[in-house]
A protein has these predicted regions:
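Amphipathic alpha-helical "stalk" segments
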Residues: 1-83
């Protein structure tokens, strides 16, 4: 998913996970999931963020965009919605 390439680019550029740019990516990810798959509530996205690092299948897939991208995306989601 191209959105994760954008997360990776921000991570690699040193942009903070709670910056406006990265938080806009979180909103973009939520809208993408809602448009293409199912209604992605804040609670659902918060859970997905946790799965991005807890489930090795998610982590491996997302980290194809760059090592640490899954962790960065999860951190950004947590910054938006809390733990």
């Amino acid at each position: 998913m191209a959105i994760f390439a954008e997360f990776a680019a921000c991570k690699d550029s040193g942009v903070s996970a709670n910056s406006a740019v990265v938080q806009a990516l979180v909103a973009k990810l939520q809208a993408h999931i809602t448009t293409h798959y199912y209604t992605c509530t804040d609670e659902i996205l918060a859970g997905l963020g946790k799965m991005y690092v807890a489930d090795e299948r998610f982590k491996k897939n997302i980290d194809k965009y760059g090592e640490g991208t899954a962790e960065f995306a999860a951190e950004a989601i947590t910054a938006k919605f809390g733990a």
